[in-house]
Regions:
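Proteolytic maturation boundary segments
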Residues: 22-41, 230-272, 276-286, 290-291, ...
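N-terminal secretory signal peptides that target proteins for export/translocation
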Residues: 1-2
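Hydrophobic, small-residue-rich alpha-helical packing segments that form membrane-like cores
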Residues: 144, 152-226, 231-238, 247-249, ...
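M16 family metallopeptidases and their MPP-like homologs
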Residues: 45, 50-64, 74-75, 92-141, ...
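Non-catalytic, conformational "gating/processing" segments within enzyme and secreted inhibitor domains
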Residues: 150, 157, 209-239, 451-452, ...
């Protein structure tokens, strides 16, 4: 009887309002999972976007956490060795085999090692069945037949050392200074995946093989297939290639529970290369693994607290209530398998650390006393539910890599993989449990947590002296805890966007450029390029291309134009504030971005084909009714001034600026002085930004989507045809004047033992470079990049990666080649000499039939994807317009690709790249 009473009481308690039964979450029905007899698990997820493409990932459920003390760095070293020899593919043959398929290392083939996992990734077309089989055979050998030859191991030591060296910068130093506080009592603290360079220098092939055999076993693996592939075919590939792996058992992955560090700590990170001064409060708490409805709600509560804090902080900065800081943020980050951190940060204006501390204390204490309002919570819920509903509507267009990554995360954490529909429906139902009161309780739980630390970041001695002592921070906390603070008043949301369109606007001419490609001229002079994509995406892309950029402005303004553009992006449009615009954009399924470059400005809006009008409204308002919030401008302006003041303290940026000024004899390359920036008002910035689109006749609108022309004409004439000429039109820019003398720049100010090398070679093309020539140069550069990788990375073990990039300036009629790498300081001359020798040899040799074939395969794959991707097709048309003044130039690329010959490529390369006009060499060395 007592047991029955207890049971009835328990059931009644669980059914009380506000209480959740820990019901399991539903797995996405599209996901196929299983396990082979040898223990290997698999996940198959059919996804038809992009068409005929598939991602194949091999996940090893072991990373650096499982290393012994004498193995720190071995997990990462083993990952590198998978590309340096297996039983069937010795030495460099694995990479060569991938390249023979037209796959590129880094883009199509890659791998990474983290604390918890090691993952190998290949992306390739599904139409090439022989290649699919061969890739699966490589995965099989990665799983069981790596060779670890001594010669290859010794060669790779230098590559890994240079990878470690390449990351020695201010960000790395800041991370190292934070780690003892953030990762206290975690295994992560002394198990960075890159490891110890002493281990890298001394580990033997036998030790690498032992680690490999201990962990690379089927029961410690998951194979993930995501893409446009039949699930039965995918399963057959897995079984045919991976079921024969021996059913050996991997060692058991150990678990190190994180212990709370239950006392308040204080940290100051003083680094001259920090871009800002600021103060932050970090909390550490157990990670919420979302396995059931209860944890689903709990994770949403933590996430909403972060979003509510960020939203309120930005609103108060925009309103002018917080003029003493230049910005701030809250975030949640994973710090261990079982632990996370929530932090709240504000950035100081200048070096006013006391003002920053006051601002953060006031924000936190206001929430302590009043919590968040029902209006704020409703706004966040509504916005997030709209995002989730949009995700349901757009699930067929999910990014393939992101989708695969989410599946890998689900596999790693052993959590359900929810479909967009289930996520939306669960959120709509379960978020009713999240109230102002429940968030207040969650907030108080956080604030009472003793596992916390204060962090102050400073970049100069003045700021360091102004940093608060632990006693001062504690006193300030007590002061604000006892201070009666006014509740925050939510300003509400204005979600209307009024557009004054001209009903008289019309199309004055029309021309067919190619199949599914049309050019329209509007009565106001604007040009419209309409393209129908071949895919099934329900996306509409609108890109306004202005032939005005920052080079249209005099030297006294040029470097501030991008800042003005950023201020506009953060201020909203028309009647909508920045926060209201985010909500309006979510409800109308639109996004907007902009970019200012030398000769052009791009304004890009993405909308939906079943509701395109909001996209046209938004681009109209961004051009005709842009705005700059005074407080946003003041904040950005202050940050720019501080960055200029401290430029001498950031050697990498100073080096890049010196190289920029060296390559051009033009005042427009020079940075403005502090007083020039300070004199530039918000009104000046807004006027400058509006001048970028001051004349419709200088704008081309590129519109791409799977939608008929007749459905768009009315929107085009109404919203694009009604854009009027400005009273102060801006002239088109002129190319920067090139420096005519060779030059060398050496800066000895690097704070870490690493050299940064850059070499620019300029070639005078005399005439514009057409598309066939550009393709020939690109084919050559792919072969050159491979030579540089083999000679400098693999044979000389001198650099982790070598960048080789060709660029063409159609206005200046010249070609530039950039060679860049980081290395051991003592070797920079040797490696630069070697790189130039490699280029001379490649110029003399030209490219081979096999190399041309690899290039053609690679480009053809890109073209196949491009035709079906609205975003990529729009970008391609824009590039054709900017590079060749012809929006239809790209339509010839497939035919030109077939017509390419080794002779034509090598002739073009020798014509254009044999004799550089100028060479500019720079090296950044340690002090």
């Amino acid at each position: 009887m007592r047991n029955l009473c207890f049971l009835l009481t328990l059931v009644a308690t669980l059914l009380l309002p506000g209480r959740l039964i820990a019901a399991a979450l539903p797995q996405d029905e599209k996901l196929i999972t299983g396990q082979l007899d040898n223990g290997l698990r698999y996940m198959i997820y059919p996804h038809a976007h992009p068409k005929d493409q598939v991602n194949l990932w091999l996940q090893i459920h072991t990373g650096s956490l499982q290393e012994e003390d004498n193995e720190r760095g071995v997990a990462h070293f083993v990952e590198h060795m998978m590309f340096n020899g297996t039983k069937t593919w010795p030495g460099n043959k694995v990479i060569e085999t991938f390249e023979s398929m037209g796959l590129r290392f880094g883009r199509d083939v890659n791998a990474y090692t983290s604390y918890d996992e090691t993952v190998y990734q290949v992306s390739l077309p599904t139409t090439q069945k022989q290649n699919l089989q061969q890739v699966m055979a490589i995965f099989s050998e990665w799983s069981n037949a790596a060779t670890f030859e001594k010669l290859e191991v010794d060669a790779e030591r230098g590559v890994i050392t240079e990878e470690w060296r390449a990351h020695q910068d201010a960000k790395w130093r800041t991370s190292q200074a934070r780690r003892p506080f953030l990762l206290a009592n975690t295994r992560n603290l002394d198990r960075e995946p890159i490891g110890l360079m002493d281990t890298v220098a001394t580990v033997t092939p036998a030790q690498l093989r032992q680690f490999y055999q201990r962990w690379y076993q089927p029961n410690n693996m998951t194979f993930i297939v995501v893409g446009d592939i039949d699930s039965k075919e995918a399963l057959a590939l897995i079984k045919d290639n991976l079921s024969k792996l021996p059913a050996n058992k991997a060692a058991e992955n150990r678990v190190w529970p994180t212990k709370a560090e239950n006392h308040l700590r204080f940290n100051i990170i003083n680094d001259k290369e920090n871009r800002v001064n600021g103060i932050a409060l970090y909390y550490r708490l157990p990670m919420v693994q979302v396995n059931d409805e209860q944890s689903f709600v709990e994770q949403a509560e933590w996430s909403m607290l972060v979003q509510l804090f960020n939203q309120r902080l930005q609103e108060r900065i925009q309103s002018g209530e917080l003029k003493t800081i230049s910005g701030g943020t809250a975030r949640s980050v994973k710090i261990a398998p079982d632990y996370q951190s929530l932090f709240f940060r504000v950035n100081a204006r200048d070096d006013n650390m006391q003002d920053a501390a006051n601002a953060l204390m006031a924000e936190l204490a206001t929430i302590d006393q009043h919590g968040f309002s029902a209006e704020e919570l409703d706004d966040v819920k509504s916005t997030r539910l709209t995002w989730l509903k949009n995700a349901v509507d757009q699930q067929a267009e999910r990014d393939l890599r992101m989708l695969t990554s989410r599946l890998a995360s689900s596999s790693l954490n052993n959590t359900p993989f929810l479909s967009p529909e289930e996520t939306y429906q669960l959120s709509k139902r379960l978020w009713q449990q999240i109230t102002v009161q429940s968030l207040a309780e969650k907030w108080q739980q956080l604030r009472k947590n003793q596992d916390a630390f204060w962090e102050q970041m400073v970049n100069n001695e003045v700021a360091a002296k102004k940093a608060l002592s632990p006693a001062a921070i504690l006193a300030l906390e007590k002061e604000y805890a006892n201070k009666k603070l006014a509740a925050y008043v939510f300003p509400g949301r204005n979600l209307s966007l009024t557009v004054d369109a001209d009903p008289q606007a019309e199309i004055s001419s029309k021309e067919t450029l190619a199949e599914n490609l049309t050019s329209l001229t509007l009565s106001n002079g604007a040009r419209v390029i309409l393209a129908i994509s071949a895919g099934e995406e329900q996306k509409l892309q609108i890109i306004a291309v202005s032939n005005k950029g920052d080079l249209s402005f005099p030297a006294q303004q040029k470097s501030l134009i991008a800042l003005a553009n950023k201020a506009v992006s953060g201020s909203g449009v028309g009647e909508l504030s920045s926060s209201s615009l985010k909500r309006w954009s979510a409800e109308n399924s639109v996004t907007m971005s902009s970019k200012v470059s030398g000769m052009n400005t791009l304004l890009s809006v993405s909308a939906r084909t079943n509701n395109p009008e909001p996209g046209f409204q938004l681009i109209n308002q961004r051009i005709t009714h842009s705005t700059i919030n005074d407080n946003i401008w003041a904040s950005l302006q202050n940050a720019q001034i501080q960055a200029l003041k401290t430029l001498d303290q950031r050697p990498a940026e100073k080096f890049a600026q010196q190289m920029y000024e060296t390559r051009y004899a033009d005042d427009r390359t020079k940075l403005l002085q502090e007083n020039q920036i300070a004199q530039f008002t918000a009104a000046d910035a807004l006027a400058a930004d509006r001048q970028l689109f001051s004349s419709p006749a200088d704008i081309t609108f590129v519109i791409v989507g799977n939608v008929a022309e007749d459905k768009l004409v009315a929107l085009i004439t109404r919203y694009l045809g009604s854009i009027k000429h400005s009273d102060s039109p801006l002239a088109a820019g002129k190319p920067l004047t090139r420096a005519t003398d060779n030059a060398s720049v050496t800066v000895k100010e690097q704070n870490e033992p690493v050299a940064q090398v850059s070499q620019w070679k300029r070639y005078d093309s005399r005439t514009p470079v057409n598309l066939p020539t550009r393709m020939a140069l690109d084919a050559f550069n792919v072969a050159l990049a491979k030579d540089l990788r083999v000679n400098i990375r693999e044979q000389a073990s001198g650099a982790y990666s070598v960048s080789s990039r060709l660029s063409v300036d159609p206005q200046a009629k010249d070609i530039s080649h950039l060679l860049a790498f980081t290395c051991q300081p003592e070797r920079h001359d040797e490696l630069l000499t070697l790189a130039n020798e490699v280029m001379v040899k490649r110029l003399a040799k030209g490219i081979s039939e096999q190399e041309l074939n690899e290039y053609q395969q690679n480009v053809q794959r890109s073209l196949d994807i491009q035709q079906r991707s609205v975003q990529q097709l729009a970008n391609t048309i824009v590039n054709s317009l900017i590079q060749y003044d012809d929006p239809a130039a790209w339509t010839e690329q497939e035919q030109l690709l077939k017509q390419m010959t080794v002779e034509n490529v090598n002739t073009a390369v020798k014509q254009y790249l044999s004799h550089p006009v100028n060479t500019y060499t720079g090296v950044l060395l340690p002090k």
